[in-house]
Swiss-Prot record:
Official protein name in the record: Cilia-and flagella-associated protein 96
Keywords in alphabetical order: Cytoplasm, Cytoskeleton
One Pfam family recorded for the sequence: CFAP96-like
Superkingdom of the source species: Eukaryota
Entry keyword Nucleotide-binding: no
GO cellular component, one term: centrosome
Transmembrane segments: none
Gene from which the chain derives: CFAP96
Record-linked InterPro entries: CFAP96
Membership in a protein family: Belongs to the CFAP96 family.
Annotated region described as Disordered, given as residue ranges: 225-251
Localisation per UniProt entry: Cytoplasm, Cytoskeleton, Microtubule organizing center, Centrosome
Amino acid sequence: MPAEGGKTDMERIGLFSEMEYITVGDKYVSQFNRPFNESASKNRQILPGGSKEMSNLQAGYFDPHFVRIFEGESYVNPNQVRRRYMMEEAKKNLSKAFLPSNGEKKPCGLGSYYGTIGGPVPFFSAQSKPKEKYEPPGKNLYTNPGKKGTGYGYANITIGKQFSHSSDLYDAAKLNNKKENEEHRRLLKGTAFKLNLYTREYFDTNPYMSEKPLPPIKKVEKKETVGNPFKPSSPGKKAGGMKAGTFDPYPSHSADPYVVKLKSPSSKSAKVFHPPGGPKSRPIESIMALNVKRALNMKNYKTASVQSY
């Protein structure tokens, strides 16, 4: 038996271990690029075993190929079953068309007079009947002749008389404006009234306003000040070492602990927790190696020409 938390020899060899579990849609990763113990660094740690999906590989079974469970059970082909059903349904179809026993019966529904007492009415017959030639009636008497148009472009058709033509002067508007200006100037009495006295202002003058020019502005002389030389700040204090330049004095040494640590009672009888193991690896042979093993044997290894991929 292995030590506590270890693996058995069968689990280390991996030939008779439990079948591998895979998920749908995972891409194939070669064993050279696959990291060692990937489950210890990715995803959540120390999880109990959940639902697993069995793989479709044949490595976990005793037989190399799948064997039928029941003896004498045959393979069912869905295409063959569907074709047999179609053939059985085709046998139900009749070769000849269906013929009635008593022949065709005359219709006696809407529009038919078969079986009635009086028979067909000649008035409702669909045949064409001779008709007399149509003569349209004459027009009524007119009391007044029709109007000629709407009046525009037609002479002497309106209620009143036509307007007589009267020619206008070429400068009629200019002459009328001139007459109005002359009449306006005739009504004027003289020129505009002008007062010969000194004009006085409506408000008093501003007492705070002076017409004298202001004196020039005196410029204040600035004294040149010589600044102190630049002095960089002192570097940051480091932990440890001499503390003479700090604000507070260095604390004195104290041998007493700040908090007394309590001893936790340990129960040696309790079992040690071991996390569940990760996925187990199996030795899988490459497809290229299988191709080489099948193509080369002890009989044709001298004359064989294997295609390289």
